Amino acid sequence: MNKPMRRVAVFCGLLILALLVRVNWVQFVQADELQTDANNRRVLIERYAHPRGDIIVEGNSITGSVETDDNDFAYKRTYTDGEMWAPVTGFASLFNTTLLEGIYDSILTGDDDRLFFNRTIDMLTGKDRTGGNVVTTLNEDAQRAAFEGLGDKKGAVAAIDPRTGEILALVSTPSYDPSTFTGNSSDDTEAWSALQKENNPDDPMLNRALRETYPPGSTFKVVTAAAALENGLIDGVDEKTAYPDPFPLPDTDGQEVGNLIDGYCPDASLRTALMWSCNTVFLGISDELGNETMMDTAATFGFNEEVFTPVRAEASQYPEDNRPQNAMAGIGQASNRATPLQMAMVAAAIANDGKLMQPYMVDQLVAPNLNVIEQTEPQEMSRPLSAENAQALQSAMESVVDEGTASNAKIDGVKVGGKTGTAQHGENNEAIPYAWFISYAMTDNGSPVAVAVVVENGSQDRNEVGGNALAAPIAKDVMEAVLAGQN
């Protein structure tokens, strides 16, 4: 072979080698990525070639699949009470899959490796392939109470069983009905477009219970109280403190912070300070403990890390900050921000004698033949405070409901502990405040429910905004719904 021919042969050989490398790269390295690419139309067509499995609440399906007359997509997803359940289910559509629909897509489509046996049997017997089911921990009555309680208000509710970490309710309003955009028509496209944030300032697709953080306001004072007890700064909830009213904010030019209610707060005990939401006491505690200790305590309750339920919840933030900002963070202001789920976790840890359980919303994954392929077991997440200190805080929080600022949460014959909050925000804190309430109900078998409620726009009159007026009645309804199911 002469020299020019050898060059051509070498060049052709290199081209063939490059082609083989590329083919193998696509086949073996990029295969999973291409198969799961949301823009891969073949994947979408296959996903909707069969009925999906269902998401289950208390034995009932809240999702379904119906046949279509579309040439490419044989089935589309349907939702029962779609707006109410959207913060739990998410959606499965040609646009995307989210939340439980997205996390467990392979189970619901039947493509999960653990369903190989079921797929094989279906193929051999000629049965249509079906997906597995996702069995949730949700309580339908509690979810409905939260959804109807919020009504047309913008806000969120999270409810947990403190003993196990099971999520009982997860509501975000305004919401959306996923059924309106699960098909392949122009109407579906219009419905999808109308829900996008750029076209809808209310952002109904934002999961406020998990993905929005708010200044927690005075509800955070129970964390500051826990920090005081756990670090030995105060010995018991009835020991008097020595913080002035008004409180001089440190390292400022004489700035002072006072209280909304006169007469109760000078030298108040933790019980009295929680009952009447004394800013001055908790400013003093946070300042005296310092930023590092306050950050550490907040972290034991779950702050500063994402929480997976398995749906991801945004990390709540107790910030590393200067002295005056740390003092303000101790009353739930400044850069302190929390999700409703996080504040439900705070109430749950106190109600469960200081033990915080990992929150979760999926109990089981079930194959089409009803075999359980995955079971969630309750797991301890942390111990933010001792049982003794937790029980002391329970006593104080129950005084808040019985004698203090949370009278609207009272339930006849039931011990209820709670804490109200009114969180300032906006430029110069001039926006309509957020109304907060966190609570738990106690029975002879421990606490079956802890709740956090936030209402963003409950009233346009600043003087009418308050956790007791706007948020506590919703929490009460949720707690009563759970308690009714215990009987």
Regions found by a protein language model. Give the residues of each.
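Beta-lactam-recognizing serine transpeptidase/beta-lactamase-like catalytic domain environment
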Residues: 168-218, 223-457, 467
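Short beta-strands and strand-coil junctions in structured, solvent-facing domains, enriched
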Residues: 144, 460-461
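Extracytoplasmic/periplasmic proteins that interact with beta-lactams or build/remodel peptidoglycan
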Residues: 1-156, 171-213
